[in-house]
Each structure stands twice: as C-alpha cells, then as structure tokens.
Amino acid sequence: MTEARRRQFKVGRVVSNKMQKTVVVAVDYLKPHPLYRKIIRRTSKFHAHDEQQCRIGDIVRIGETRPLSKTKRWEVVEIIKRNEEA
C-alpha cells in the first residue's frame, strides 16, 4: 500500500475570477538559467476551487486536493491579503 503524501501549499495572486467557483492563481518562483546561472523569475498559473470569495489581485494560499475537474487540482485555503482597489 502506498503512503499518503503531504499536502502541498503555494502562495500566489489571483489573476482571474471570471469562472464560477474557480479562480486562476499566478505563482511566481525563482529559477537559475540553465546555461548562464542568472536567477530569473518564472510564473505558473493554477486553476483553484473557490466558493466565490476571491477578487482579482488578492494574495491567497492554495492547497493540493483531489482532481475536481480536467484542470482543477487546487483549492483556495485562505485569503492572506485582500486587494484594496477592487
């Protein structure tokens, strides 16, 4: 029998909330260039389940979960900082 994996968490910014109960979260990370070794900033986008609470620009923590749809494998665990402008 396989061991249960620890749940992974990521912190990112909400870039889209146009879908029902789904937000797109952009997570920035730093990675060295393979040849020149300069540190460059990269961005990954994740679709996360949200019960229509997040707004664009919010900083959120997302956690890994079971597959909820074709592209959704994450859920919003908490809203760390609300966007003041929206």
Swiss-Prot record:
GO terms for biological process: translation. Pfam families: Ribosomal_S17. InterPro entries: NA-bd_OB-fold, Ribosomal_uS17, Ribosomal_uS17_bact/chlr, Ribosomal_uS17_CS. Keywords: Ribonucleoprotein, Ribosomal protein, RNA-binding, rRNA-binding. One of its GO terms (cellular component) is cytosolic small ribosomal subunit. GO terms for molecular function: rRNA binding; structural constituent of ribosome. HAMAP family: Ribosomal_uS17_B. Belongs to the universal ribosomal protein uS17 family. One of the primary rRNA binding proteins, it binds specifically to the 5'-end of 16S ribosomal RNA. NCBIfam families: PRK05610.1, uS17_bact. Part of the 30S ribosomal subunit. This is Small ribosomal subunit protein uS17. It comes from Roseiflexus sp. (strain RS-1). The lineage of its organism: Bacteria, Bacillati, Chloroflexota, Chloroflexia, Chloroflexales.
